[in-house]
Amino acid sequence: PDFDDFESMVQVTAASIRSLLGPTTPFNLAGFSFGGLVSANVAAQGLAVKRLALLGPGGHGGPRRERGKLVNWKRALTDEELLEAMRFNLWAHMIYADEQIDPFAIGIHTYSCINTRFRSRGISGRGLLGPALDVYPGPTLIVWGEHDITCTPDYLMMHMIEGQPNRRGVILPDVGHWVNFEDAERVDPILVDWFAV
């Protein structure tokens, strides 16, 4: 569907889950980046979310650490220019280690950029994550990469995790924003353990 705004996206997503699972069926919910912000806001809608896991969630409202200005890939005139723009943007925004920027990562990133149906950039800076987490009372895991440029993980640990007994924060060393791609060997077991409870 076409979404007019973030709130309508959250409402439609929550309604779809209720329709598919029923209003009282417990389920676990996870999201990455903007999907983490959406997941937190869906969980705040009163659904039967047992446990929530957010990987490098957007919408925190805290400081960012830019690594480089993103290239406008829509201006690419050739396949080579598009490939180079995507490679650079992965380095500048998503992945810390150069060797992780492989054809598979570039392919996923390119497909996602070309096929996105919702422009999230302006929403991710609005600070909508904290209020949603304050409403959702269940266990919440947030995983950040140490070099995530979309945030300052230590700052968020202090402001979103400390003093919140239902929240757990993990900062993974030597990875960037796309933690679930760049370090699946560490992220996958963390998620399996989190949702196994």
Locations of the language-model features?
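Catalytic active-site module of serine/aspartate enzymes centered on a nucleophile-bearing elbow/loop
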Residues: 165-197
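Active-site loop/oxyanion-hole signature of alpha/beta-hydrolase fold enzymes
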Residues: 1-30, 45, 189
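Conserved loop-alpha-helix segment in the C-terminal half of the alpha/beta-hydrolase fold
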Residues: 141-175
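Conserved catalytic-core motifs of eukaryotic protein kinase domains, centered on the activation segment
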Residues: 1-2, 64-66, 153-154
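Catalytic nucleophile loop
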Residues: 31, 35-36
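Conserved alpha/beta-hydrolase catalytic His-Asp/Glu region
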Residues: 65, 80-138
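Flexible "cap/lid" loop of the alpha/beta hydrolase fold
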Residues: 37-44, 50-81
